[in-house]
Amino acid sequence: MTYANDSAHFDLDKTEESKPRIALMGEFSAGKSTLSNLILGESVLPTKVTATRLPPVWVAQGDDAPFRMDMRGDVHEIDLNALDRVRPDDTAVIKVHKPVDLLGMCDVIDMPGISDPNMTTAAWDDLIQSADAVIWCTHATQAWRQSEAATWEALPHTLQDRSLLLLTRFDKLISERDQAR
């Protein structure tokens, strides 16, 4: 089923009554999806899905059917068990609804890795403009790479001011010196 720009199904415009939208950003395998699953208390996507092959995944409260919005703004219902058929180059966002209490307070947007060759900066730029804050996940063993710093600098300063840096995989730091840094 296709809905041409049907705002009843998907609305990127902020309204006064909209909930905060928290974007999870960082490099590939930095723990964004793991963090999403942890804070939501359940896996959002089937475990067989390779997150690095997905466009942004927007999770909101509810039980509506999942869908994807293509680059033209058209909305298409999707099967979460067939996400391997979703083309990241033609999908602006996947929206999934879950009956999770936390989602009554905020939406979560799980962004692809910032170095994803399948997604241009322009493709996620429109979506990140909808975010109210970012939780930036970075590997503790390789924290704050040049690519992360460059992407961070490209974000609106108002968004930077309301965001957090989360060091993931801290347990991989073995020496006390590395842990102290």
Q: What positions do the PLM features span?
A:
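Globular "head" domains of long coiled-coil molecular machines
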Residues: 16-181
